[in-house]
């Protein structure tokens, strides 16, 4: 197969790569600022009016929409922006772009400094925990929730106390509290910014007396001072952070610590994206490359689905069911007991 392209084709392709980089960041910004929701509801918006209503710098707002227009997400018709041919798909995946740019942008920006081995000591990279929590709330809702609720509906019992590891914004615990009146929730997160955000969310939605949070690392759960609360938990959940348990020996130890720390858990719902195998470079779906490359940069091992299957029994758990998620790379919710 010929790979030759004309000079004009190469020039256009490289310009598209450059513009797509800006558009990628603009998707996350347009979501956070409310533009994508307004376009979804109305099909169009007036740029000047939008800037005034949200107290935004109008020339920069024009630039944001120009970036989106350069890749077909919107079209600019004078002072009006209308949805483009790729709007629905981009809007559906908007939280993934926010995770990549607003949450992990600093990691990728410093790629030349992060890659050299001599620099990979101590805290050698930085991400925005608050932005990641903001994005992960919708990532969880759009991609993991159908599989999660299918697992919850099949529990065979009504949970009384739920603990969520890597609880982020606290949204999962809020949803569970809505589903099961009277249930108590406990979030465990390592990031102070995420806990502060979650506490505000929980209080604002009226669950401050049911849901609480503790700062802690799931990998060293035995060092978290919440033994009494942990002993009451009968449903344990963990989403989008199970890969932090790895490599294998560490994962087995973490699973054993969790089994000991939560002695009365009847089900452990563990959901995560896994490392893909065998996908050609030019056919990688959305999110996969950013997720895998980003974690490689951070030195975080990403297991394959088969590798996950090989640790549960040794870690003190039995996998009773797997709920596949086809819309987000190779992702899954494991039902463990």
Curated annotation (Swiss-Prot):
Catalytic reactions on record: 3-phenylpyruvate + S-adenosyl-L-methionine = (3S)-2-oxo-3-phenylbutanoate + S-adenosyl-L-homocysteine + H(+)
Keyword Methyltransferase among record annotations: yes
EC supergroup of this enzyme: transferase
Gene3D superfamilies, sorted: Vaccinia Virus protein VP39, Winged helix-like DNA-binding domain superfamily/Winged helix DNA-binding domain
Protein's GO biological process: antibiotic biosynthetic process; methylation
Keyword annotations: Antibiotic biosynthesis, Methyltransferase, S-adenosyl-L-methionine, Transferase
Pathway(s) this gene product operates in, as recorded in its UniProt entry: Antibiotic biosynthesis
E.C. number: 2.1.1.281
Keyword hit for Cell division: no
GO molecular function: methyltransferase activity
Pfam families xrefs: Methyltransf_25
CDD domains linked to this entry: AdoMet_MTases
Family per similarity comment: Belongs to the methyltransferase superfamily.
PANTHER family attached to this UniProt entry: O-METHYLTRANSFERASE CICE, PUTATIVE (AFU_ORTHOLOGUE AFUA_4G14580)-RELATED
Function: S-adenosyl-L-methionine-dependent methyltransferase involved in synthesis of the nonproteinogenic amino acid (2S,3S)-beta-methyl-phenylalanine, a building block of the antibiotic mannopeptimycin.
Name recorded for this polypeptide: Phenylpyruvate C(3)-methyltransferase
């Amino acid at each position: 197969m010929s790979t030759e392209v004309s000079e004009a084709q190469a020039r256009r392709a490289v310009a598209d790569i450059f513009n797509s980089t800006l558009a990628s960041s603009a998707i996350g910004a347009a979501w956070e600022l409310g533009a994508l929701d307004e376009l979804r509801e109305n099909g169009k918006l007036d740029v000047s009016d939008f800037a005034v209503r949200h107290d935004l710098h109008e020339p920069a707002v024009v630039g944001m929409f120009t970036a989106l227009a350069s890749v077909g997400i919107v079209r600019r018709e004078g002072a009006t922006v209308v949805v483009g041919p790729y709007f629905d798909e981009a809007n559906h995946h908007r939280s993934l772009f926010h995770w990549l740019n607003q949450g992990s942008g600093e990691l990728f920006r410093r790629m030349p400094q992060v890659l050299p081995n001599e620099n990979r000591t101590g805290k050698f990279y930085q991400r925005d925990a608050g932005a990641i929590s903001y994005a992960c709330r919708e990532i969880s809702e759009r991609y993991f929730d159908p599989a999660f609720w299918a697992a919850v509906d099949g529990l065979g019992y009504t949970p009384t106390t739920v603990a969520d590891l890597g609880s982020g914004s606290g949204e999962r615990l809020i949803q569970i509290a809505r589903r099961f009146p009277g249930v108590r929730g406990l979030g465990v997160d390592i990031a102070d910014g995420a806990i502060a955000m979650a506490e505000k969310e929980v209080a604002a939605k009226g669950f401050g007396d049911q849901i609480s949070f503790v700062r802690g690392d799931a990998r060293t759960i035995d060092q978290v001072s919440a033994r009494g609360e942990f002993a009451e938990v009968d449903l344990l959940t963990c989403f989008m952070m199970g890969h932090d348990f790895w490599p294998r020996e560490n994962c087995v130890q973490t699973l054993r610590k969790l089994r000991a720390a939560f002695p009365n858990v009847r089900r452990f719902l563990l959901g995560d994206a896994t490392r893909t195998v065998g996908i050609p470079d030019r056919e990688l779906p959305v999110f996969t490359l950013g997720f895998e490359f980003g974690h490689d940069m951070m030195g975080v091992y990403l297991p394959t689905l088969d590798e996950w299957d090989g640790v549960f029994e040794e870690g003190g758990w039995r996998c009773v069911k797997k709920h596949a998620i086809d819309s987000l790379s190779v992702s899954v919710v494991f039902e463990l007991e």
